């Protein structure tokens, strides 16, 4: 009698068996001679305390890859850790009066238990959290090595300052010009900050990203644009009339469009340009203007979105190509001091930002690029700048030239006059890593009045965070700690003070993959790196992934990594999100999916029985309460169902919508698989597969399915692999009442159990045991296929009459062309079209098509 599979009892049992046998512990290279290696890594999580379905999808994908590689004979490293520093822990400390460390480690234990329930094949022996002193101590040692190499330095830099919380805010924490928590207007302040010199690798990072063939093209393009290599001209506009002290030679500007110099109608300085600062010393109005600019966030995006602000300095400069023509000098809030020279020339006709500025302040607009086919006498620029192709006009010696030729000619003219030179610039800026927060990696330096900045000796690392801190007042607890920051200088022994800034948490995640490879063994790191398959969200395309590429190069160059290419991730996959419908009560309150029910095509609130407004399908978020608790899904259906559904319903790079009906369908399929396996005799051994037509057809189905699943996993088409498994199970079940197919069915069940391991490992183990096996299928090899059973001996051809498809025919691959022709003409749907007509010729293209031409 058939039994029912019970995931609630089966899944814990198999997880215990895996852990007892310790089957996911990574083998040392010497213990896996001859085996290829596979380092599979998903972006490690922040320990927020609860998993969400996005986590389930991300880590289920990585587990498919890791389990598949193991079954294919690879030595697999599939680790897990915690990206544990950051602001949420400090916020919890303030709100709940609990130490950030206590809150973080409690969350880690909670999430680890959730991960365990998912049946992930993780090597927990390599687990660490970035807030572990061992980890951040190694990071501090690395910081000092980079500092010795000249890749770390300090400089004054603009930051977003919250005057109420007394802290620096990241750009994303500034909302409409106000602090995200205090609501206070944010100020721009200049603070001395620590920087990593990522620009030292700009060319290498840009050139190498195009060689990452196993990265999504979208991510490679995003990184290339972020690095932003631009060739242009750095030139000096000489003053016409008054020459401010220190700027007697003029104003140096950088432009990527020297072809539009004849269209220049203003020069604009950054509010932080040295000349602006000098002029502001004698102008209260300019001081007030700079203060207004300082209320805007420091990010390019914030500045770009802000209203265009301008201040006329009253100064003018001479146009380099038109004697007697002068150009006014303004200060503009959209000019960045950190890019180029901190000054630009504006050509409103061919740059939208310049045009918006010019229209607001009544500045001239001179078109100098004529679109193809446009009338030079009639062409005008309206509210949109023209940034397309064309040739140069109204530009003296540049007239008639293409844009590229005009750029070269303008640069040559400026260089010949000694007014500037062609130059390459980058959008990429050095990475500011100072954070005025407690819960982060302490920067391992001390400040001595006599010796300056002194690195902490290696013997004194890690510089540990003090435990006795309070969060009852705003600001950095390290700054106001009575003892921690006071220390003797390691060089001269005199009283000094510790650096109280901590490192940006992106530093923690920029080298963790190397720590997973080995804590300290350079040979083991060389063996495992680069990561063979990295999996995570596309939102990390620029910052995390770019910083990691910088760090791996820097670590290589200070002798920490034997990684000639400098690339940390050979393959990258960016998965889509898990989405869900949104629900609102009649009063407009967001409702959780568990708070609503469907009846007769309508949705009602369970508590009140009132109708619910069903909103858009969106990314799961706490704010809109459209989240599904993985623990609840596991408790109801089992982990295999959760894993199966998030992988089955959509290509992995696209979003997947979580639905109750989808989960129920996955649960039914689990029972369908079990009912097939359980239909086999309980005692073996099973007979060898028969050679009758039905058994042979079933064996072909078995072997073709394995080949298709194998290929789909390799190509990250997990949903296709799952679709193949569905079809395969259907084929197997159709023959379960035929005694002659027992051998072929038993072969199929054995292969199916092995192929289910990457997707539904608990069910796979139960099926394996039901087949009489005493080992763990998670340690079994991938099924071997018989090539002769995978190759079709028939082929299906399209049959056309006068080029129009009328039918199709399946014939033996080696059937003679004249026999194919005769069979095609005999098809009813073909015979009716050629009856009574003269067949002029018949074209048979082997393996593809039959075309009958009639008159």
UniProtKB/Swiss-Prot annotation:
Gene Ontology, cellular component aspect: cytosol
EC number of this enzyme: 6.1.1.4
GO molecular function terms noted in the UniProt entry: aminoacyl-tRNA deacylase activity; ATP binding; leucine-tRNA ligase activity
Assigned keywords, A-Z: Aminoacyl-tRNA synthetase, ATP-binding, Cytoplasm, Ligase, Nucleotide-binding, Protein biosynthesis
Amino-acid biosynthesis in keyword set: no
Location of the motif 'KMSKS' region: 619-623
Classification via Pfam families: Anticodon_1, tRNA-synt_1, tRNA-synt_1_2, tRNA-synt_1g
Xref: InterPro entries: aa-tRNA-synth_I_CS, aa-tRNA-synth_Ia, Leu-tRNA-ligase, Leu_tRNA-synth_edit, M/V/L/I-tRNA-synth_anticd-bd, Methionyl/Leucyl_tRNA_Synth, Rossmann-like_a/b/a_fold, tRNAsynth_Ia_anticodon-bd
Record GO biological process: leucyl-tRNA aminoacylation
Xref: Gene3D superfamilies: 2.20.28.290, 3.10.20.590, HUPs (3.40.50.620), Isoleucyl-tRNA Synthetase, Domain 1 (1.10.730.10)
Enzyme class of the recorded protein, top EC level: ligase
Residues engaged in binding ATP: 622
Domain of life from the UniProt record: Bacteria
Principal localisation: cytoplasm
Reaction(s) this enzyme catalyzes, per UniProt: tRNA(Leu) + L-leucine + ATP = L-leucyl-tRNA(Leu) + AMP + diphosphate
Subcellular location: Cytoplasm
Motif 'HIGH' region in this chain: 45-55
Protein family membership: Belongs to the class-I aminoacyl-tRNA synthetase family.
Protein name (record): Leucine--tRNA ligase
Naturally occurring in which organism (per UniProt): Hyphomonas neptunium (strain ATCC 15444)
Gene from which the chain derives: leuS
């Amino acid at each position: 009698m058939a039994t029912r599979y019970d995931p609630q009892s089966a899944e814990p049992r198999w997880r215990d068996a895996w852990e007892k046998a310790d089957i996911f512990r990574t083998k040392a290279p010497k213990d896996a001679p001859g085996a290829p290696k596979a380092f599979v890594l998903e972006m490690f999580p922040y320990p927020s305390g609860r998993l969400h379905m996005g986590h389930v999808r991300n880590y289920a994908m990585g587990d498919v890859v890791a389990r598949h590689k193991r079954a294919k004979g690879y030595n697999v490293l599939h680790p897990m850790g915690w990206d544990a520093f950051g602001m949420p822990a400090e916020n919890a400390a303030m709100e709940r009066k609990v130490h950030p460390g206590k809150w973080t480690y409690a969350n880690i234990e909670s999430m680890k238990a959730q991960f365990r329930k998912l049946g992930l094949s993780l090597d927990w022996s390599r687990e660490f959290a970035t807030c572990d002193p061992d980890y951040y101590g190694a990071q501090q040692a690395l910081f000092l090595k980079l500092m010795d190499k000249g890749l770390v330095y300090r400089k004054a830099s603009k930051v977003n300052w919250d005057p109420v919380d007394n802290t620096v805010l990241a750009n994303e924490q500034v909302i409409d010009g106000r602090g995200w928590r205090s609501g206070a207007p944010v100020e721009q302040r200049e603070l001395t900050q620590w920087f990593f010199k990522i620009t030292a690798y700009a060319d290498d990072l840009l050139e190498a990203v195009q060689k990452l063939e196993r990265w999504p093209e979208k991510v490679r393009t995003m990184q290339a644009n972020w690095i932003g290599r631009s060739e242009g001209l750095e030139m000096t506009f000489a003053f016409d009339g008054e020459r401010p002290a220190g700027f007697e030679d003029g104003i140096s500007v950088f432009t990527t469009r020297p072809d539009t110099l004849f269209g220049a109608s203003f020069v604009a300085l950054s509010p932080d340009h040295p000349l602006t600062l000098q002029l502001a010393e004698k102008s209260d109005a300019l001081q007030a203007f700079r203060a207004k600019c300082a209320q805007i966030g420091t990010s390019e995006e914030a500045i770009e979105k802000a209203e265009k602000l301008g201040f006329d300095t009253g100064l003018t400069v001479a146009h380099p190509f038109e004697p007697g023509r002068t150009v006014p000098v303004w200060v503009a809030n959209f000019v960045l001091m950190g890019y180029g020279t901190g000054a630009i020339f504006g050509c409103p006709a061919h740059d939208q930002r310049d045009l918006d500025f010019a229209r607001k302040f009544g500045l001239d607009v001179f078109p100098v690029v004529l679109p193809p086919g446009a009338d030079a006498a009639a062409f005008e620029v309206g509210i949109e700048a023209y940034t397309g192709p064309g040739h140069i006009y109204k530009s003296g010696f540049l007239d008639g030239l293409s844009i590229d030729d005009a750029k070269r000619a303008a640069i040559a003219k400026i260089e010949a006059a000694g007014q500037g030179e062609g130059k390459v610039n980058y959008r990429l800026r050095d990475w500011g890593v100072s954070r005025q927060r407690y819960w982060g990696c302490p920067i391992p330096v001390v400040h001595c009045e006599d010796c300056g900045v002194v690195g902490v000796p290696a013997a004194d690392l890690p510089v540990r965070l003090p435990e006795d801190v309070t969060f009852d007042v705003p600001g950095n607890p390290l700054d106001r700690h009575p003892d921690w920051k006071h220390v003797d200088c390691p060089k001269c022994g005199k009283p000094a003070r510790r650096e109280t800034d901590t490192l940006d948490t992106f530093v923690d995640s920029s080298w963790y993959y190397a720590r997973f490879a080995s804590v300290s063994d350079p040979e083991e790191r060389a063996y495992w790196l680069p990561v063979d398959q990295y999996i995570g969200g596309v939102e990390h395309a620029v910052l995390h992934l770019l910083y990691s590429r910088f760090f791996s190069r820097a670590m290589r160059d200070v002798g920490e990594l034997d990684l000639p290419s400098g690339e940390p991730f050979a393959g990258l996959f960016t998965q889509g999100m898990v989405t869900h419908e949104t629900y609102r009560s009649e009063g407009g309150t967001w409702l959780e999916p568990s708070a609503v029910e469907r009846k007769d095509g309508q949705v009602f609130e369970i508590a009140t029985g009132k109708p619910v407004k069903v909103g858009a399908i969106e990314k799961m978020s706490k704010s809109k309460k459209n989240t599904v608790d993985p623990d609840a899904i596991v408790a109801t259906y089992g982990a295999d169902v959760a894993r199966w559904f998030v992988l089955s319903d959509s290509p992995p790079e696209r979003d997947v919508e979580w639905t109750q009906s989808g989960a129920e369908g996955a649960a039914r399929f689990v029972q369908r698989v079990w009912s097939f396996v359980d239909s086999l005799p309980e005692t073996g051994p099973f007979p060898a597969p028969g050679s009758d037509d039905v058994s042979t057809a079933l064996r072909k189905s078995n072997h073709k399915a394995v080949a298709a699943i194998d290929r789909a996993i390799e190509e990250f088409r997990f949903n296709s692999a799952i679709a193949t498994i569905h079809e395969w199970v259907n084929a197997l079940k159709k023959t379960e009442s035929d005694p002659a197919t027992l051998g072929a069915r038993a072969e199929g069940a054995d292969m199916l159990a092995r192929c289910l391991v990457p997707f539904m490992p608990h069910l796979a183990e139960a099926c394996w045991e039901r087949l009489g096996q005493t080992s763990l299928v998670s340690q079994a090899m991938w099924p071997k296929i018989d090539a002769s059973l995978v190759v079709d001996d028939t082929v299906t051809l399209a049959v056309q009459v006068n080029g129009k498809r009328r039918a199709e025919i399946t014939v033996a691959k080696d059937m003679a062309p004249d026999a194919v022709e005769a069979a095609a003409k005999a098809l009813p749907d073909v015979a009716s079209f050629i009856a009574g007509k003269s067949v002029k010729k018949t074209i048979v293209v082997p393996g593809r098509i039959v075309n009958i031409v009639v008159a």
